[in-house]
């Protein structure tokens, strides 16, 4: 039946072609007229150019032609047909990208041509430029401008560079300044105005400022920045200085190293690296210190935190912050999140594990939030090669890529209308090895040997790890550049017998032999899996492997259990455990945010896990022949002595990290901190309060050890300072702080806050301030001091506590005197034995110096202050 349908369809198309040969001929001839226009522009032959246009528009086109070469100084051009519509045998419409360029600039226009066939030749009746004209530049150093000067001084906010007797190489752009290479003896002084950034600098360099001798500097800047922030004192004796070949080569080498790193994009038409011009006070200053090495100072008034100091030897952000605003100064902040929202994806990918090769097609629906939206911005792995990008009418779109920042810009032919959904399709492919995940993992052993039961060390080959996880960090599809939530339909094709698990519901599974569907597994060469998300997600993930379906529980929420090849034990009870955890969190956080939950256990080189929307991955280490599991070393977050820990932590991420995510890196704790807190509370509920002494003791020790690296609001930047510091602060310190907050508010009120916070921000990004606002609205308390101390500071309490016991009114009075070095707010638990029973009492410390009296019936003994180490810091 299928073959008969295909044959009929082929015959129909063949007849259509035979019956309408004129349309096919018209399409062929359209290419001829475009070629004629191209050749006439290349030869700068205005007469030949005008022959392609009707008499009514020749005068206008002659003016346009001459302006390009005479007024704008263009020297050559290239035309790229982006789409055509043959309306009839004698009428057609064509869209063309026209690229004009000279030695330093590029102009890109999109032409809409309406053509009419006269005397067997196509002629342009109307030509309109649609969309915005794109102007880009080809910056070069060295150019024909160089000079030796007496001094150069660059001063901006918190940085100052000075050079004496320096050699300056200017860029090739006429009538404005945008780039400069300075060679010579100089010095740099950088001192961040932000107190936390000073502290971080001191940790790295033992000083809260940087000072070094320089050998060169590379600058990109706006013309305004050049006039206001760069002072050049010229040397009258060296006005006609001619640099040597060695000096010229050095300038070119410096320029070639730094130029691709900022204000540059690779365009899709001729694949050349083109440059935008810095705007307002934008500036990039690269410099090489004799001791410090190569750094880049970046200032962008269009971002939340304008100043960024970056060290290239280890690709590390040293400082990033916003300087204090000067009086009367207004900050400008531009976000693509305000310009459009991604609403839906339809993605079709195939992955070949043996070759690590991925190919895909992504249809992306967006909703403009501004009038006349002319471009889109996505994140895409630069290892993936873009084949083409088309709009809803199949027309090829112009795009550019910033490979260093993994950013893709797509430009509409015609600007899109506000609130009217539109779509594009992106075709791409390339070799892509899934990157290693760094969050929620604990490093496993690197040497495959163990001391067996008889005391003999045995080495063995590492196992085959046959799972491939593509998640957010892989940027395997054109992802939103902001925190957009969207729905999606994903089709993944893999070689048989590999399988795929992804976000949402599996709605279709097909076995294939080449492109034909088969039913017999023995005939299958590949398998296709189709998933649909019923609820919004913030990113898409899929894992490929050879999985065993170990069962499911569909009593309330569908929960499924899979394990990968290499795992030889089923781990009974995991479905019931997952069910209990979900129920526990629903009571405290709110309804489970997705339609199903898949638990995927895989053999891997690290313990830990990962939690995309609607499924979680639990890593398990290899078991050696005597049943021993190779256990990883110390980690701040390892609570694996309780087997429920990892699954509880990863399931908590379905609420915190997935359904509610963080707005900026300052808010990372909303994901990892709340998930860790939830896991600890589940362990407490299952095993009793006794577990808190061990857990909080460990968390406090690690917090005290790593707190110096920064506050909770430093977020992901802590990883750059010390990976263990990130876990100690974001996971552990946050858990302790949230536990203190629960003690301050009361358990019922605290979980009411979490439920309301989750309800307000479900399927969206939230901030620390959003969390504080929710708490203060529900509790009626001002918690600014609490959050500043525990979330905004790297300091910890230093507390002197003295106590005394006196008889009073037939009983006893326990008196406490508390003195703090800094003002922290915290609940302080005191524990003692009274009449043979353990008693605990909480007092709220909210002043630097405080005294408390506790009335008792019996005499207290074995008095303990902060018994579970629930408050990190020094207690004397």
Regions found by a protein language model. Name each.
Residues 74, 86-138:
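Exposed beta-sheet edge and beta->alpha loop/turn motif
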Residues 67-93, 107-109, 338-344, 793-802:
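A short, amphipathic edge element
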Residues 531, 561-817:
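Hydrophobic alpha-helical and helix-loop surface patches within well-folded domains
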Residues 278-281, 287-337, 379, 467-469, ...:
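Non-catalytic accessory/interaction domains
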